[in-house]
């Protein structure tokens, strides 16, 4: 019985190691050729690799006017060699100031006569990974303050910082902006109202969205 108990404990330990090892990784941004079955709204169709390829997530018909404006600041095209030959990125540690700087760098692009005036508040969620080409992949949810409308607003950012420190933005939108029934960006409340909208990280559940590509 003792041997059986030891064997069971060993098996549990092995399963635990495999589980957490899998959890340490997240998906390459923009690498997949086929649309994801569980998220058909995303299209990763690639153009010939000797040209630039489609990079930014498509803007859905249900997007709010706010998100249509934000989508202008994504990178619609990226060099073919940006992720060509890139490996699955390994999770990497990050500092608060690092992800704050990436968020502020993306936010600095939001300019124009019809663009909102947004001030950075804080990062709520972040994930970071590095591939074999030294590209750094970021997935960040952060809060901003709309100075004109007096709103606090949650934004999502999916971006790649290449080896030359150029930031390529794949997704930049209000939180849960892809929901058809939205009348306005979710995660938005008057700054005087508390608490803020509950944070539900459905846009970063890579284990669910990309489970069919787990071995890519």
From Swiss-Prot:
Parts of the chain that traverse the membrane: none
Domain of life (superkingdom): Viruses
Region feature Hydrophobic, mapped onto this chain: 1-21
Main location: virion
Annotated keywords: Capsid protein, Late protein, Virion
Induction record: Expressed in the late phase of the viral replicative cycle.
GO CC, any one term: viral capsid
Location within or outside the cell: Virion
Role: One of the minor capsid proteins that constitute a network internal to the major capsid proteins and outside the lipid membrane. The minor capsid proteins glue and stabilize the capsomers.
Domains (record comment): The hydrophobic region might anchor the protein in the underlying inner membrane.
Subunit annotation: Interacts with the major capsid protein.
Name the UniProt record assigns to this protein: Minor capsid protein P6
Protein species of origin: Paramecium bursaria Chlorella virus 1
């Amino acid at each position: 019985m003792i041997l059986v108990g030891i064997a069971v404990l060993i098996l549990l330990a092995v399963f635990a190691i495999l589980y957490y090892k899998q959890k340490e990784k997240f998906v390459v941004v923009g690498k997949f050729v086929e649309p994801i079955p569980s998220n058909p709204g995303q299209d990763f169709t690639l153009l010939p690799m000797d040209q630039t390829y489609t990079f930014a997530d498509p803007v859905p018909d249900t997007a709010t006017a706010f998100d249509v404006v934000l989508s202008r600041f994504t990178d619609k095209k990226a060099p073919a060699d940006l992720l060509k030959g890139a490996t699955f990125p390994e999770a990497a540690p990050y500092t608060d100031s690092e992800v704050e700087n990436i968020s502020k760098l993306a936010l600095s692009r939001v300019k124009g006569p019809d663009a909102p005036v947004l001030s950075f508040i804080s990062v709520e969620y972040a994930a970071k990974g590095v591939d074999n080409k030294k590209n750094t992949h970021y997935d960040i949810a952060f809060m901003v303050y709309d100075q004109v409308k007096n709103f606090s607003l949650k934004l999502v950012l999916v971006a790649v910082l290449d080896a030359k420190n150029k930031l390529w933005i794949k997704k930049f939108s209000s939180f849960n902006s892809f929901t058809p029934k939205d009348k306005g960006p979710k995660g938005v409340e008057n700054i005087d109202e508390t608490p803020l909208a509950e944070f539900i990280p459905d846009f970063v559940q890579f284990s669910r969205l990309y489970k069919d590509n787990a071995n890519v």
